[in-house]
């Protein structure tokens, strides 16, 4: 039987400083901000999906009685997300990182020839940019 799941719609990272995250993801990475709810979360459009940035101090709390029944959740420590670059444009991405003083931790080719670069957001989350062919896309 084939899986009924079509794709990942959203993925989440957790940060302690939403202002720093907003400046990084909106300013440095130039993702389109969808919405922000105070010090609880900020959401960004990322291609056909959504990147959710949460403050775990807020999302670990149970939902208010008058709120949607989203279960409490939270993560501590460094997470990871990998972005697929438009047109495999590593030069443009590296320029953006360099212009903003963001260090590249690693830049290499996988055994199948796909390239990946790794760097960190202000919260210490591990971010990767890779070619779709890494996963046969």
Predicted regions and their residues:
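Conserved active-site tyrosine of GNAT-family acetyltransferases
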Residues: 21-28, 97, 124
């Amino acid at each position: 039987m084939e899986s009924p799941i079509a794709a990942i719609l959203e993925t989440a990272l957790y940060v302690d400083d939403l202002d720093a995250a907003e400046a990084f993801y909106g300013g440095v990475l130039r993702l389109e901000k969808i919405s922000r709810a105070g010090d609880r979360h900020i959401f960004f459009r990322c291609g056909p999906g959504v990147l959710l940035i949460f403050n775990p101090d807020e999302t670990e709390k149970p939902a208010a009685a008058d709120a949607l029944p989203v279960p409490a959740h939270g993560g501590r420590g460094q997470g990871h997300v990998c972005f697929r670059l438009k047109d495999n444009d590593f030069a443009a991405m590296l320029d953006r990182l360099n212009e903003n003083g963001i260090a590249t931790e690693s830049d290499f080719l996988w055994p199948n020839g796909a390239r990946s670069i790794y760097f960190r957001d202000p919260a210490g989350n591990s971010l990767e940019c890779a070619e779709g062919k890494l996963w046969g896309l």
